[in-house]
Design a protein with these regions (language model features):
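Nucleotidyl polymerases of mobile genetic elements and RNA viruses
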Residues: 1-220
Length: 220
C-alpha cells in the first residue's frame, strides 16, 4: 500500500511525520518570499472524514490500485457487519449496524484512509493543473485527511477537490477551512459558506506566521 502514496503524504508512514510537513511549509514560504513570489494556501478540512468512508467505493478504489482480491476480501470481512451501541445517561441504545467509515482503533484504518485520499487527489488531476509553486514542483502537502493546497496564482479555488471528495463520501467542512495569502486574494464562497482568510495559521498543531516563522509554545 505504501508504494501507492506520494512523498507529499506524511501521515502514518515510516520516516515521515508532522514535523517534516511543518518544516516543508515554512521553507516554501521563505523561498517564495526570497524569490518575490506570491503564495496562496488553502487548508482543507473534511467533515467527519474517517466516519464517512463509503465501503463499496473503498473496495473499488483498492481494486483499481491493484490490491490483491483476497486481501480486499479480508478487509471487507473485517469492516462489514460491524455493530455498535451508544451508552447515554438514560442507558444504552439498541444495537445498530455500522455502514460507513473505517474502524476506529484499527491499525489498518490510517492506511485505508490514505489510499482513499490519494484516489481523491489523483482524480482531481492536480498533477495536470497549471497552478502550483514553480520554484518547487509541488501544489499540495498532506497529513492523513488534512490537505494543504498551494499555488502562486489566485486560481487556488481551481485546485479544490470538492466533486471528487463527494464521490467517495467525503464532504468539505467549509467552516473549518482557511485561506492564507502572501499576495492579493478575494474571499471564497463555496456552497453558500465563506472560507475565512487569515494571516497567521495553525498547521498540524503549530502556529506559522506570514513570514514563515514557527511560533514555539504550541505543542504538536
Amino acid at each position: 500500500m505504501n508504494r501507492e502514496l506520494p512523498d507529499v503524504q506524511a501521515a502514518f508512514r515510516k520516516g515521515r511525520g508532522a514535523r517534516d510537513q511543518i518544516a516543508n511549509i515554512c521553507w516554501i514560504i521563505k523561498k517564495t518570499r526570497e524569490f518575490q513570489k506570491n503564495i496562496h494556501f488553502c487548508f482543507i478540512d473534511y467533515a467527519k472524514a474517517v466516519d464517512c468512508v463509503d465501503h463499496n467505493k473503498l473496495w473499488k478504489i483498492l481494486q483499481e490500485m491493484g490490491i490483491p482480491g483476497h486481501l480486499i476480501c479480508l478487509l471487507r470481512n473485517l469492516c462489514e457487519g460491524q455493530e455498535a451501541t451508544v451508552r447515554t445517561e438514560h442507558g444504552t441504545t439498541d444495537w445498530f449496524q455500522i455502514e460507513k467509515g473505517v474502524l476506529q482503533g484499527c491499525i489498518l484504518s490510517p492506511c485505508l484512509y490514505n489510499l482513499l485520499a490519494e484516489c481523491i487527489m489523483q482524480n482531481s488531476s492536480l498533477d495536470e493543473a497549471q497552478a502550483g509553486i514553480k520554484i518547487v514542483s509541488i501544489n499540495n502537502l498532506r497529513y492523513a485527511d488534512g490537505t494543504t493546497l498551494m499555488t502562486e496564482s489566485k486560481e487556488l479555488k481551481s485546485l479544490l477537490m470538492k466533486e471528487e471528495s463527494e464521490k467517495v463520501g467525503s464532504r468539505l467542512n467549509i467552516q473549518k477551512m482557511k485561506i492564507t495569502a502572501h499576495g492579493p486574494i478575494t474571499s471564497w464562497q463555496i456552497d453558500g459558506g465563506t472560507v475565512e482568510t487569515v494571516a497567521d495559521f495553525i498547521f498540524l498543531g503549530s502556529k506559522i506566521t506570514a513570514d514563515g516563522d514557527l511560533l514555539l509554545g504550541r505543542k504538536l
